[in-house]
């Protein structure tokens, strides 16, 4: 069987099963869904989030992989735009886009940009509502470039440690100038510990 163009990887929790189901329903009704696989891993919290991400990564068959957590959201054209970018830009190692983020009630936009340094995050726009950073695990990564990168066995910081590895293996990027992903963090409901440094 021909591998899919994109593997969407979702670590999930049983206490958010309705959110996970809504995400899947949103994905399957988008044009281009026949070219992807959506892998969802539920567990009883016996594994860390890092190990859940690692298991999903090792199970993926797509040419590209992208993480979408069960409490995140995607645009109505998320699948379509990513499949178009993958097919029209075969040279790309990573495909970036913009993200709508809501962090403990504070909304802002994240502009993922290949080559941007997280240690020099650039806050732009009125009231510092736009943040520029390097490609994150939610972006679409060519699997052959990053399949050997390992997630840490931890419930916090596994994403940053993984992208620090992955960025070293990509040289060419394509950016989609649109918000395709929505990230929500609420300290009242998250299963991860609160970071010591907040955005």
Residue ranges and their predicted role:
Residues 102, 108-109, 117-141:
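A recurrent flexible, glycine/aromatic-enriched loop bordering the glycosyltransferase active site
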Residues 69-73:
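The conserved acidic donor/metal-binding loop of glycosyltransferases
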Residues 79-111:
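Conserved donor NDP-sugar-binding/catalytic core segment of glycosyltransferases
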Residues 65:
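Short aromatic/hydrophobic "clamp" motif used to bind/position activated sugar donors
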Residues 176-199:
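Active-site donor/metal-binding and catalytic loop motifs
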Residues 12-30:
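Short, well-formed alpha-helical segments that are part of the catalytic scaffolds
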Residues 44-60:
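Glycine-rich, basic loop-to-helix element that forms the pyrophosphate-binding segment
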Residues 156-162:
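Acidic donor-binding loop at a coil-to-helix junction in glycosyltransferase catalytic cores
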């Amino acid at each position: 069987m021909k591998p899919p163009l994109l593997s969407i990887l979702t670590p999930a929790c049983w206490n958010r099963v309705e959110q996970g189901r809504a995400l899947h329903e949103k994905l399957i009704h988008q044009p281009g869904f026949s070219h992807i696989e959506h892998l969802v891993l539920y567990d009883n919290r016996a594994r860390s989030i890092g190990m859940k991400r690692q298991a999903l990564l090792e199970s993926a068959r797509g040419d590209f992989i992208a993480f979408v957590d069960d409490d995140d959201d995607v645009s109505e054209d998320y699948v379509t735009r990513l499949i178009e970018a993958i097919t029209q830009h075969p040279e790309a190692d990573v495909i970036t886009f913009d993200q709508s983020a809501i962090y403990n009630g504070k909304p802002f936009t994240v502009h993922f940009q290949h080559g941007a340094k997280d240690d020099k995050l650039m806050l732009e726009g009125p009231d510092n509502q736009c943040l520029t950073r390097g490609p994150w695990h939610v972006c679409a990564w060519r699997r052959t470039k990053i399949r050997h990168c390992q997630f840490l066995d931890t419930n916090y910081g596994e994403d940053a440690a993984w992208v620090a590895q992955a960025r070293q293996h990509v040289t060419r990027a394509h950016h989609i100038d649109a918000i395709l992903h929505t990230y929500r963090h609420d300290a009242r409901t998250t299963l991860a510990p609160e970071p010591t440094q907040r955005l």
